[in-house]
Every structure is written in C-alpha cells, then in structure tokens.
Amino acid sequence: RVDMRTGVMETWLGTGERKPTPDGAPLIGTAVNGPRAIDVDPQGNLYLALREGNAVYRVDTKAGRFVHLAGTGEKGNAGDGGGARQAKLNGPKGIAWSPDGGVYIADTENHTVRRIDLKKGSITTVVGDGERGDGPDGVALRCKMARPHGVFVDRRGNLYIGDSEAHRVRAVKR
C-alpha cells in the first residue's frame, strides 16, 4: 500500500513466495500465489483473483485472515452449479464485487466470466461458452470470448468485461 501523505509504499500482503494461500491463514506472513486483480466491498473486505493459484479469496480485514472462496488450485474448467471451493478455474485475472451478493471473476483461460454466490458458496458461468472466439452478441452463455481479463459491476448491476484478445468491452445489462 502507499501512504498518500508521504508517498512511501510497503508490502501489505504476501511474502514474495510462489506458494498456495491457506484458508484461514493470517494476513501477515502468508504467501499470495499470483495476485492479478483486487476489488473491495462496502465493509472494506478485499477480493483477490490469484492467477497462479487458480483461486479466489476474500481478505477479511477485520479478522485479519484469508477466506478461500473458489477454486481448488488446480487448472481446469469444472464445478459449474456446485460448490465454488470445489470448482476448477484456469488463470483468473479479473474480479468484481457486486451489490447482488456475488463476486464476478474473469476465468481468463477458460474464456468465461463466472459468478460466486457469496451466500450459497456456489459458482456458475454467466458469460461465455468456454470456447475461444469473438461473439456473437446475444445470449451471454452462447458468446465466445478471447481471454477476458477485466470485469466491473456498476451500481445498477450491469456487468462489463474487458475481452482482451477480441479487442472489445462487452456488457451484460440488467
């Protein structure tokens, strides 16, 4: 983090080691395996997409602990409709907290966007058919994407996706 008054930066999370991040581990002294994207909820909790870790974590800032939300750590594309922690992700690079009670992730190498339901602990694909490509516009689950990286959810719940190799910003409107 950066102290905006002094301009001094310091490491806030991670040890510099490429190791798995254990569920429930303290924030200090724990490895963070390939953080690629960060978002925050209104309570001040951070959400991390870990590319090399093929996982998603909540950083519980009040308790000072990592909470494992999704991904087994193994590369793959599995688990849709089931428990998010048992799902396989492949290089997640984007993350967005949403006011609808979910967290959206760009599951980059699977060419999809998936939603974690924070109350149920489940995961579903919401955009993309899993094949690399470009479009067509229309039904979100039939759309091909090419390595989506960024995701953003606005106050109204509209989802925006940076579809990197298709050179487009896609939108799913509520």
Regions picked out by a protein language model, each given a short descriptive name:
Residues 40-43, 97-100, 153-156:
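Residue-level detector of Asp-centered blade-edge/turn motifs that repeat once per structural unit
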Residues 94, 108-109:
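Loop/turn-rich, solvent-exposed surfaces of beta-rich toroidal or solenoidal domains
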Residues 1, 8, 54-58, 111-115, ...:
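A short loop-to-beta-strand structural motif that recurs across blades of beta-propeller domains
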Residues 4, 51, 61, 108, ...:
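Short loop/turn segments immediately following the C-termini of beta-strands
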Residues 6-34, 63-91, 120-147:
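Gly/Pro-rich loop segments of beta-rich domains
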Residues 45-48, 102-105, 158-160:
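Conserved beta-propeller blade signature
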Residues 147-174:
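Blade-level signature of beta-propeller repeat domains, shared across WD40, Kelch, NHL, RCC1
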